[in-house]
């Protein structure tokens, strides 16, 4: 997909870069697979902010995505590729031979008219879903389960890809894009290929307003706050953070400090993403 730049009629247009997607469906989504979603503005049921930098943005309908791919052995035809405002990847509308329609994450190279299938004996082709025990070592995969039958949890964003590097006993070893090596049960399912819309990372919004349209509010530096608001706050004129090590608003070290405390699943990480 080509990239598009604009005439510099304003500072926002001068900096913007967009991905041209002429093959995307121009109409409304499939009505039976759409539901409304309310916005919290980052607040909990007490009205207090629990997630910062969230609020505003354009209204969106949620597209119900089939992350489980549990219609086994039934072929489906790709009707169209659609835009999904809830994720960076595009989605594909499948029509099964029994008439049912479902959305899936669109892998790279998938187009309208292609056929896909899920099952243990499915061919190794982009868009097909198989258990890890039936996928050849070295294959590039995405939409991977962490627990059998729970649905895809890993590698769902635009351009995401994971490589199956080994299989030993009841576990398969995966190399994630971050560099992390992780063990996953071989009964977990994964989809062949990498996620489409891989040029999404080359896009530039161009102006702050484009970020606000997406429901993202500004991020304020701690050093620009008062001491009551942040450990880095206060000082005369443009003072620095003052601390020997940077911390979060709640005093927890940041910028490289490890915060993972889930010992139960630590055994499945063969190599940390930091090396």
Curated annotation (Swiss-Prot):
Q: Which NCBIfam families match?
A: rplB_bact (TIGR01171)
Which PROSITE patterns does the UniProt entry name for this protein?
RIBOSOMAL_L2 (PS00467)
Source organism superkingdom:
Bacteria
Primary role: One of the primary rRNA binding proteins. Required for association of the 30S and 50S subunits to form the 70S ribosome, for tRNA binding and peptide bond formation. It has been suggested to have peptidyltransferase activity; this is somewhat controversial. Makes several contacts with the 16S rRNA in the 70S ribosome.
| Keywords, in A-Z order | Ribonucleoprotein, Ribosomal protein, RNA-binding, rRNA-binding
Give the quaternary structure: Part of the 50S ribosomal subunit. Forms a bridge to the 30S subunit in the 70S ribosome.
SUPFAM superfamilies, alphabetically? Nucleic acid-binding proteins, Translation proteins SH3-like domain
Recorded GO molecular functions are: rRNA binding; structural constituent of ribosome; transferase activity
Annotated gene: rplB
Q: Name one GO cellular component term.
A: large ribosomal subunit
Q: Could you tell me what this protein is called?
A: Large ribosomal subunit protein uL2
User: What is the originating organism of this protein?
Assistant: Stenotrophomonas maltophilia (strain K279a)
Q: Where is this region: Disordered?
A: 28-49, 224-246
Protein family: Belongs to the universal ribosomal protein uL2 family.
Q: Does the keyword Ribosomal protein apply?
A: yes
């Amino acid at each position: 997909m080509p990239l598009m730049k604009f005439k510099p009629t304003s500072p926002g247009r001068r900096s913007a870069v967009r991905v041209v997607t002429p093959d995307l469906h121009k109409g409304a989504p499939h009505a039976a697979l759409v539901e409304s979603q309310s916005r919290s503005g980052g607040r909990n049921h007490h009205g207090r902010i629990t997630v910062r930098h969230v609020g505003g943005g354009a209204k969106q309908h949620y597209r119900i995505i089939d992350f489980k791919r549990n219609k086994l052995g039934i072929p489906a035809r790709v009707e169209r590729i659609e835009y999904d405002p809830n994720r960076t990847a595009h989605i594909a509308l499948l029509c099964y031979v029994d008439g049912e329609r479902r959305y899936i994450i669109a892998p790279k190279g998938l187009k309208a008219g292609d056929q896909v299938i899920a099952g243990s004996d499915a061919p190794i082709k982009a868009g097909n879903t198989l258990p890890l025990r039936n996928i050849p070592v070295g294959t590039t995969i995405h939409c991977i389960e962490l627990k059998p039958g729970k649905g895809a949890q890993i590698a769902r964003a635009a351009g995401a890809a994971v490589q199956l590097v080994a299989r030993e006993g009841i576990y398969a070893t995966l190399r994630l894009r971050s560099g992390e090596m992780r063990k996953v049960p071989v009964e977990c399912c994964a989809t062949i290929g990498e996620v489409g819309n891989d040029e999404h990372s080359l896009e530039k919004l161009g102006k702050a307003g484009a970020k606000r349209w997406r429901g993202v509010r500004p991020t304020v530096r701690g050093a620009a706050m008062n001491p009551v608001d942040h450990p880095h706050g206060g000082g005369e004129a443009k003072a620095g953070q003052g601390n020997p090590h940077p911390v979060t608003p709640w005093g927890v070290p940041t910028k490289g400090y490890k915060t993972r405390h889930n010992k139960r699943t630590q055994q499945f990480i063969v190599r940390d993403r930091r090396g």
